Amino acid sequence: MASSARFSLVYRHIGREYLLSFLVAFFFFFFIFFINQILLIAQRILLKQVDYFSVLQLVLLSIPQFLLYTFPFSSLTASSMVIGDLSGNNEILAIRSSGISLKHVFIPIIIISLAFSMLTFLTADKALPWSTKKYRELYTDLMRDLPTLELMANSTNTIANTVMVNKGVEGNTVHDIILFETSSVRGGQILSAPKAEVSLYDLQSFIYQLELDNPLILKSETQGGWALSKAESAQFFLNFSGQIASIASALPSQLSIKELQQNIQEHKIALQAEKKRYQEKVQTLELSLAELVDKAKTDAEVSVSHIEELEVQLKQLKDQKPINFYYQYYRAELHKKYALSAACFMLVFLTFSLSFFRVKHGRLIGFGLSMLVAVVYWYLLFFAQMQIFSLSISPALLIWSPNLLMFFGGLLFLLHARRL
């Protein structure tokens, strides 16, 4: 009974300190990683004179995609700060002197980190897809009300078959505008105007009307000539349906587990068909090469260079094994959701070896070490994502490699520290 009470006291103390440190770390990472991007979103929308409530909604709906990294790094930092503080204040020494194993210090951290892993998984699988859908619906509604929402000042915008260059954008007014036509019907036509007003023309098709003031129209003729005309005003129509389509489609990282699995299955079938065609090409080329080699044994007129050419083609074909871009991409994003969720639990093992060292300012030292580990983990995960398109191996191995490296590295450090 007394032993159980001692463990309970340790669990409550460690758990409370871990949760408080997690809260501090969570707000730190939230502001460091995300407040700048949130302010950029708010600034971009506010400059378009969108109401404050809509801006607030967009900001809130953007938060779940940031939480996927906030939870793992906060869990790591909290564990590092707590264990560093306990070691620095000799609390670890006191616990060990009382005959309590260090595993009872680690148990509450592991259990709470597992809860954070589950919370991260729910964010990735439920909250992120839902918030993305609502974000795109709201943004689409704003585009209906404000046509220039997708038009940035001092920028170049491609809208359907039209390339638009403009300077200032104020409300529905666009200044110093130049329009380049790239369609086959009116290719080579250029329009310019000092000012233009954008207004909604067709709500269902997202077509907007551009009222040009004092436009100049330059048209290139097919025979090499050109024509220049001027008018007091002109009407031009912009088709924003392409922009709406891109907004309405979610990125693979914003899909749920179920949606990712469905897309993976579709692209797996496509990859299998591609591999079948690839094998047929290889077999056809090998057969042609074998026939040519057999023929060369009896026919001296067979060109040796032709045989060498086929051998080179066969070697190049075997080196270029088919890789389905989307099959790799969707599988990588699926495992990334699991890996980031598991990181809340796996990264804390790197901090356990700190319990065997007594350092001054242990909380600060732990915080600094966690920052270093977070940067290394971020880099490894980013590097692994870049390799999924160039390597034909399973994306699961690449995406999980940073987690496994950190986890087993933590176990090795812990075993080594115990022997010191």
Per-region residue spans from a language model:
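Transmembrane helix boundary and interhelical loop/hinge segments in multi-pass membrane proteins
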Residues: 79-93, 98
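Membrane-proximal, non-transmembrane alpha-helical segments
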Residues: 290-334
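Long, hydrophobic alpha-helical segments
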Residues: 63-82
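Start (N-cap) of specific transmembrane helices in multi-pass transporter permeases
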Residues: 13, 17-21, 104-117, 125
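Short, membrane-interfacial amphipathic segments enriched in basic
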Residues: 1-11, 45-53, 316-324
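Short helix-to-coil transition segments within interhelical loops
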Residues: 96-101, 391
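Non-transmembrane, extracytosolic/lumenal segments of membrane-associated proteins
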Residues: 53, 57, 113-237
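Transmembrane alpha-helical segments that form the functional core of multipass membrane systems
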Residues: 322-416
